[in-house]
């Protein structure tokens, strides 16, 4: 319990009620996933009681996990029904992958920093999310051997949408990615593949993410 006598499950429910619902997150499956996944298991031990605060939390190696609202917003934008295969770029601590795994059939998650990839595997195994596959690689190139994906979620800001990710998106699938300046504001875009050559784009507003590094990202 924290100093006010609240346990983390109470704080998790309050996060959903006070942070997500008032900001328009309405997909019941997303709200249930956010209430069910123990975010405190995906942050450093000394930050467990900050896990549900309305801001990003540092996880080491100069990286953070996004605030709960952003994770929920990106998950909701994918419109997952439960049978999808999803690509998650920027595993971090594994938290977003766990949320996505609660909403989809299978998740493939890529992390470029070996130490974070190893810790994410431990976090996901410990919390029972065995349907998440984690590898250490350049996320801007996707996971071609596992493609196509019904959803792709990118947790880092890109200068442009990587062509490899668009190519690995199934027809009817959705790609959610922040695009904009390095270290500044980005637009959170949702790109839907309409056919082999046609895509539709919508914006979910301004966000601020760490830069997406890699061959098709920032150098």
From Swiss-Prot:
Q: What is its main location?
A: cytoplasm
| Keywords, ordered alphabetically | Cytoplasm, Methyltransferase, S-adenosyl-L-methionine, Transferase
Q: Where in the cell is it found?
A: Cytoplasm
Which HAMAP family does this UniProt record tie to the protein?
A: PIMT
One Gene Ontology cellular component: cytoplasm
Function, as annotated, reads: Catalyzes the methyl esterification of L-isoaspartyl residues in peptides and proteins that result from spontaneous decomposition of normal L-aspartyl and L-asparaginyl residues. It plays a role in the repair and/or degradation of damaged proteins.
Give the matching InterPro entries. PCMT (IPR000682), SAM-dependent_MTases_sf (IPR029063)
The UniProt entry, under Pfam families, shows: PCMT
- Decide whether keyword Manganese is in the record: no
- What is the protein name given in its UniProt record? Protein-L-isoaspartate O-methyltransferase 2
The chemistry this enzyme catalyses reads:
[protein]-L-isoaspartate + S-adenosyl-L-methionine = [protein]-L-isoaspartate alpha-methyl ester + S-adenosyl-L-homocysteine
Q: Which Gene3D superfamilies match?
A: Vaccinia Virus protein VP39 (3.40.50.150)
- Which gene is this protein's source? pcm2
Q: What EC designation does it have?
A: 2.1.1.77
Q: Name one GO biological process term.
A: protein modification process
Instruction: Name the lineage.
Output: Bacteria, Pseudomonadati, Pseudomonadota, Gammaproteobacteria, Pseudomonadales
Residues in the active site? 66
What family name appears in the similarity comment?
Belongs to the methyltransferase superfamily. L-isoaspartyl/D-aspartyl protein methyltransferase family.
Q: Which GO terms describe its molecular function?
A: protein-L-isoaspartate (D-aspartate) O-methyltransferase activity
CDD domains given in the database record? AdoMet_MTases
């Amino acid at each position: 319990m924290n100093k006010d006598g609240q346990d983390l499950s109470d704080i998790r429910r309050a996060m959903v009620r006070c942070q997500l619902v008032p900001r328009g997150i309405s997909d019941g499956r997303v709200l249930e996933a956010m209430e069910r996944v123990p975010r405190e298991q995906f942050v450093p031990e000394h930050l467990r009681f900050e896990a549900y605060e309305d801001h990003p939390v540092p996880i080491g190696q100069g990286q953070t996990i996004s605030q709960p609202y952003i994770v929920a917003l990106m998950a909701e934008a994918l419109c997952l029904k439960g049978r999808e295969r999803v690509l998650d770029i920027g595993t971090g601590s594994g938290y977003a992958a766990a949320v996505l795994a609660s909403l989809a059939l299978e998740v493939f998650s890529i992390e470029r920093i070996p130490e974070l990839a190893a810790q994410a595997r431990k976090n996901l195994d410990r919390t029972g999310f065995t349907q998440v596959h984690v590898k250490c690689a350049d996320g801007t190139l996707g996971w071609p051997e596992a493609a196509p994906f019904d959803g792709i979620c990118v947790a880092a800001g890109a200068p442009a949408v990587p062509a490899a990710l668009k190519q690995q998106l199934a027809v009817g699938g959705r790609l959610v990615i922040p695009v904009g300046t390095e270290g500044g504001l980005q637009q959170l875009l949702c790109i839907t593949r309409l056919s082999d050559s046609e895509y539709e784009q919508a914006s979910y507003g301004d966000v601020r993410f760490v830069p997406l590094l890699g061959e098709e990202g920032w150098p």
